Amino acid sequence: MNYYEVGKIVNTHGIKGELKIISKTDFPEDRFKPGNILYIRDNGKINSYEIKSHRTHKQFEMITFKGLENINLVENLKGKILEISEEQQENLSDGNYYHHQIIGLDVFSEDNNYIGVIKEIMSPGANDVWVVKRKGSSDLLLPAIKDVIKKIDLEQNKVIIELLDGLD
C-alpha cells in the first residue's frame, strides 16, 4: 500500500497531548477532521492513529490523537511525518493534482529543452511555487499559474512550461 505525506509534527503544545503540525495538504479541514486516521512510520513499522480533535492556530494545525491525551505519550512523535493511505485520497477534478504527483516530474520548455526536475512545492500565498532543481545552476522558482505551466503529462512524467521574462 502507498502512503502520502500530509503533514509533519514539529512540536507538542500544552500538557494534554496536543501536537503542532505543519500541514502539507491543501485540505487540512478534511485531512485532520476528528475520527480520521493518520499513519506514522516508526522503525520500519506503520502505526495508525485516530484524530480526536483538530483546530488551526496561527499557521499550524493542532491535533490530538485518541488515547494519547498526555504530553508524555506524544513527546516521541516530534519530528515524525503524518501520512494517509492511498485509499484515503479523494479524486480531484481535471487540472488539479496532488503534490506527490507533481514532485519528481521533469520540466521542459515549450521548445523541448530540459530544464530540471520538480523537487518541492511551496505555498507562499496566492498560488503554489514549484522549485525546480537544475543541473549546474541555482533552483528555478516557477509560479504554478496557467501563463507558465502549459501542460502536465503524468504518463510521460513531464511538465511543459513557458519561461516568462524574469523567471530565469
From Swiss-Prot:
Location, primary (coarse class): cytoplasm
Key words, A-Z: Chaperone, Cytoplasm, Ribosome biogenesis, rRNA processing
Keyword rRNA processing (UniProt): yes
Free-text domain note: The PRC barrel domain binds ribosomal protein uS19.
Subunit structure comment from the entry: Binds ribosomal protein uS19.
InterPro entries from the UniProt entry: PRC_barrel-like_sf, PRC_RimM, RimM, RimM_N, RimM_N_sf, Transl_B-barrel_sf
Intracellular or extracellular location(s): Cytoplasm
Name of the gene this protein is made from: rimM
Species the sequence originates in: Ligilactobacillus salivarius (strain UCC118)
HAMAP family from the UniProt entry: Ribosome_mat_RimM (MF_00014)
Protein name: Ribosome maturation factor RimM
Residue ranges of domain PRC barrel in the record: 94-167
Sample GO molecular function, one term: ribosome binding
Gene Ontology biological process: ribosomal small subunit biogenesis; rRNA processing
Transferase in keyword set: no
Function: An accessory protein needed during the final step in the assembly of 30S ribosomal subunit, possibly for assembly of the head region. Essential for efficient processing of 16S rRNA. May be needed both before and after RbfA during the maturation of 16S rRNA. It has affinity for free ribosomal 30S subunits but not for 70S ribosomes.
